[in-house]
């Protein structure tokens, strides 16, 4: 049975897509082809219940003789309430884990903006934060696990890293500061290749697209109901080219706003204070200078 020996496990809106794209074509590395939604086998109970053989067949059937095999599931880091670390350790105790950690205040806002663009969020950022705990507790169905409106909690890296540090040795966990991945890409890729035990090779750089907002959050939620999972692809096409195959597609294009609406100073101050203790934990275990996170 083909199983991974490394996982890029998150977090959401921290650069994991950029990272996996960068290393995908390395001759000694196998990553499954990009699929939406992401794998999330150890996070989603309805996937995990299908068993390890299903996981192997769906995601690693095409793996060849590469030295190392892996997968990317951005939600794993945030699965402390679902015992994700315990699940992974039960089946692949020697796995190598890679986590990207971004300024949690910026990460929360990026996560919110993605949920808005995906049609999962009708509230302003401030209102969504004020309702987060209630929504988390009352979520039902697939939302009970996926939690598309969980923004603030996902930046508590101390809470989310501790289960992995409890189950896995520190040498099996590689943490990447997202800001360094962006500013010092080659250095961070070299360190990652060393961690994986593969030689340095040229890497891919993902194309960067404009960070879109929407004119109407309510309209975007209605477009989600109309398109379902296809909305993500339709929106991506609209970001890259003039893509209008139907009246609905024209509405998608009309609702996209080619700019990033900034976070308010009051919300930023609230989040910086909220994350202060967690950031100290990250700085302590990594030695990183996190003055740019304050």
Kindly give the residue locations of the regions a language model identified.
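PAPS-dependent sulfotransferase catalytic core
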Residues: 1-77, 91-95, 104-141, 168
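PAPS-dependent sulfotransferase catalytic domain
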Residues: 52-61, 121-205
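Acidic-and-aromatic substrate-binding clefts and catalytic sites of carbohydrate-active enzymes
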Residues: 44-50, 76-82, 152, 180-184
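Short aromatic-enriched loop/helix-cap "lid" or pocket-rim segments at secondary-structure transitions
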Residues: 82, 108-113, 119-120, 187-189, ...
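ATP-dependent NMP and nucleoside kinases share a basic, alpha-helical "lid"
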Residues: 80-99
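Generic structural signal for small/hydrophobic residues in well-ordered secondary structure
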Residues: 15-16, 70, 88, 97, ...
């Amino acid at each position: 049975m083909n199983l991974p020996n490394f996982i890029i496990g998150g977090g959401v809106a921290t650069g994991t897509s950029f990272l996996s794209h960068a290393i995908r074509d390395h001759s000694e590395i196998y990553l499954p082809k990009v699929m939406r939604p992401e794998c999330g086998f150890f996070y989603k109970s309805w996937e995990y219940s299908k068993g390890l053989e299903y996981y192997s067949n769906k995601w690693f059937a095409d793996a060849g003789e590469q030295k190392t095999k892996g997968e990317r599931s951005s939600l794993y880091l945030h699965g402390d309430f679902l015992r994700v670390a315990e699940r992974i350790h039960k089946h692949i105790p020697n796995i190598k884990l890679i986590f990207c950690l971004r300024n949690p205040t910026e990460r929360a806002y990026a996560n919110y903006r993605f949920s808005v663009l995906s049609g999962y969020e009708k509230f302003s950022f401030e209102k969504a934060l004020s309702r987060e705990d209630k929504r988390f507790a009352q979520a039902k169905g697939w939302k009970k696990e996926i939690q598309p409106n969980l923004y603030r909690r996902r930046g508590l890296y101390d809470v989310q890293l501790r289960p992995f540090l409890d189950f896995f040795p520190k040498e099996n966990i590689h943490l990447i500061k997202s800001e360094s991945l962006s500013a010092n890409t080659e250095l961070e890729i070299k360190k990652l290749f060393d961690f994986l035990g593969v030689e340095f090779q040229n890497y891919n750089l993902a194309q960067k697209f404009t960070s879109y907002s929407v004119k109407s959050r309510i309209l975007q939620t209605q477009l989600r109901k109309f398109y379902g999972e296809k909305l993500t692809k339709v929106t991506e096409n609209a970001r890259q080219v003039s893509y209008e195959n139907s009246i609905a597609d024209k509405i998608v294009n009309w609702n996209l706003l080619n700019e990033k609406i900034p976070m308010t100073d009051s919300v930023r101050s609230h989040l910086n204070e909220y994350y202060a203790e967690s950031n100290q934990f990250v700085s302590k275990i990594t030695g990183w200078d996190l003055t740019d996170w304050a």
